[in-house]
Amino acid sequence: MDINKMTYAVQSALQQAVELSQQHKLQNIEIEAILSAALNESESLYKSILERANIEVDQLNKAYEDKLNTYASVEGDNIQYGQYISQQANQLITKAESYMKEYEDEYISMEHILRSAMDIDQTTKHYINNKVEVIKEIIKKVRGGNHVTSQNPEVNYEALAKYGRDLVEEVRQGKMDPVIGRDEEIRNTIRILSRKTKNNPVLIGEPGVGKTAIVEGLAQRIVKKDVPESLLDKTVFELDLSALVAGAKYRGEFEERLKAVLKEVKESDGRIILFIDEIHMLVGAGKTDGAMDAGNMLKPMLARGELHCIGATTLNEYREYIEKDSALERRFQKVAVSEPDVEDTISILRGLKERYEVYHGVRIQDRALVAAAELSDRYITDRFLPDKAIDLVDQACATIRTEMGSNPTELDQVNRRVMQLEIEESALKNESDNASKQRLQELQEELANEKEKQAALQSRVESEKEKIANLQEKRAQLDESRQALEDAQTNNNLEKAAELQYGTIPQLEKELRELEDNFQDEQGEDTDRMIREVVTDEEIGDIVSQWTGIPVSKLVETEREKLLHLSDILHKRVVGQDKAVDLVSDAVVRARAGIKDPNRPIGSFLFLGPTGVGKTELAKSLAASLFDSEKHMIRIDMSEYMEKHAVSRLIGAPPGYIGHDEGGQLTEAVRRNPYSVILLDEVEKAHTDVFNVLLQILDEGRLTDSKGRSVDFKNTIIIMTSNIGSQVLLENVKETGEITESTEKAVMTNLNAYFKPEILNRMDDIVLFKPLSIDDMSMIVDKILTQLNIRLLEQRISIEVSDDAKAWLGQEAYEPQYGARPLKRFVQRQIETPLARMMIKEGFPEGTTIKVNLNSDNNLTFNVEKIHE
């Protein structure tokens, strides 16, 4: 017995047989140990052949185990188990060797062991019974005329079935979604496939535009016989490159597998069209020192026209991998696959609608499909149609499906209330005092009412679930009948096709309509139902909001109120700048109502005015009121961009420079939060060339970063602040606080000297902030003191400041050229510092109120007024 004349699978089975003998404490390797090991080998050919012959493999394996247990085990010291081979096992190998010679093979393979076992082993004979000829035929089919010339022959057996999937067969079985549209690309692919040489199309397009769908569409046309005569007998196999590479342990095994696949394709005489998705992976696949990569193995067959191949890859990967190998590139014909427009996407979604309804057991409204196409096109800018629209519909269906599977909120609340009352009831039953008895009686009455309510709701939910289940079942039956009709028409079974088309399908459609009408009549409007089974445009809007953070769903009442009173909310934080507040809040309202220009940002403003008048504060308060947090504001301090080259920090370093992979500060922030407030603070400090980047943001609502990706700014509010012209404003403002026309012109003159006209012309509005008046200061004092009280609240302390003291604080800190900041510092010195010293020195108890007054010497006095008990 020469182990080197056996395949790796047989060698592995013998090794496993030795281990089995050791487990059973047997000195000899019995025939059952070898056969059991062969059966349990990973990817066992022995097992695969028996399964295809419909033999109970598990029972056969158990029979081998039972037979092994009948052999006498040997106990003792220094006994070597599994060192010798039994007479019957030796006969098995000898007989297998004779089969090897009969098949003209070079190595003993698993099929030889199986043939030998069928002749020698009684257990195997018993289970195979009268299926000997069937197994011989299966072995012949599996081998496919190949000879065992290597120690890993299984690689060559049925290579296409192992490393690919038959798309035409999947279409026949109804496993594939229908392909709608893409007729021109499919026709182009068919034309290229019909050529004599270089008949290999490669589909090139962005991810998600439907490259794979075109090949699936071709497979569907082949099944429907809607192709030229030359393609009628063809089948399309999708090659699974990952399966081809996975588990290739030995050097050259990958090449061996690929050669086996190509050999099968070649021997089919052009009947098999090989589809390789992500074809760029072939370039370099399996490449090791001195080895040939997969791309080079394909070239000769492609050139001779022996291999019909369809490839699919993206533009970037085609350029990076295939264009570099010009010899491979010239063997393919390019078919450009462009992104479909919104109308085509809606048609595609309508075609897929029924399949998704049947799969999820829901009903999809047409307006949900329209919303999915339109909203995904508008808001999800980093992906492509129709993929992103299909994903939206699928996600919305899954959301409704999960809701249908769980209890409605109303019933859930009642269930929890009943459980709570039952626990309370069991506790009160153990009490004997009158108060507890009284409470128990009240509780039992409430529990009875809640249980009655629970039963009514449960009954309603069960009724709705039953009706929905009936609808789902009827839709599934209709889908199966339509699939059966297609099969009957394809197979020219006219009698069955007529029965389905004019009998079964109309009847099922009628029954489905009746069920839907009854459900509609009984349950009323969708809003009255306990369980929702309809996907509407609202669900689509909610999912777009989840994915992007952009609010596109319908306005709820609370948000409606917030938007209508947005200017009032902003006025509470920003004092004295009515025009600026109104302009910003109006822009937000326009955007949320859906009537803003879809190709520009929500708003772009330049705030001009002296320091400390509320320019930055307005941007912060807008972010806080829109997103409930100032953290959603993207703040960029333009004083950091004083050099011309600093613009690369906004959009990312160019290729070849350090930090190219990190992206830009502005572009990356907006990609993560497309709905945000962008504050470009102190713009006059930046280099003027930096603003050239803003041109396309302000006009087109997008910016291309250093990697060539387009970043969408259409859902941002851009606010720039500057102190340009602040001196003119301070000197020429009226006593009433109004800004005169001449002052405005003087400020604009200063502005034109700094900014280029094309930037100023693209802004929605240039807002002049007026210097703060003495009246404004008193309001700001109130605001600062409110914030101080919020901080003190954590220590259960409060502060009350008299009106005289507030007026004195505003008067003393009033410096028009510096705005509100001196007031903040003045309050820190006059109130916060003395208060902090008192707190550290005296340690106020919780509930203390400190009263601050102004004495006759114009000094502030601090009195501990009262302590709350």
Curated annotation (Swiss-Prot):
Chain residues that bind ATP 1: 205-212
Gene3D superfamilies recorded: 1.10.8.60, Clp, N-terminal domain, P-loop containing nucleotide triphosphate hydrolases
Annotated segments matching region NBD1: 158-339
InterPro entries: AAA+_ATPase, ATPase_AAA_core, Chaperonin_ClpB, Clp_ATPase_C, Clp_N_dom_sf, Clp_R_dom, ClpA/B, ClpA/B_CS1
GO-annotated cellular components: cytoplasm
UniProt cross-references to SMART domains, sorted A to Z: AAA, ClpB_D2-small
Region span, NBD2: 559-771
Any one GO BP annotation for this protein: cellular response to heat
Annotated positions binding ATP 2: 609-616
Region (Repeat 1): 6-71
Function: Part of a stress-induced multi-chaperone system, it is involved in the recovery of the cell from heat-induced damage, in cooperation with DnaK, DnaJ and GrpE. Acts before DnaK, in the processing of protein aggregates. Protein binding stimulates the ATPase activity; ATP hydrolysis unfolds the denatured protein aggregates, which probably helps expose new hydrophobic binding sites on the surface of ClpB-bound aggregates, contributing to the solubilization and refolding of denatured protein aggregates by DnaK.
PANTHER family linked to this entry: ATP-DEPENDENT CLP PROTEASE, HEAT SHOCK PROTEIN 104
Complex formation: Homohexamer. The oligomerization is ATP-dependent.
Protein name per the record: Chaperone protein ClpB
Organism: Staphylococcus aureus (strain N315)
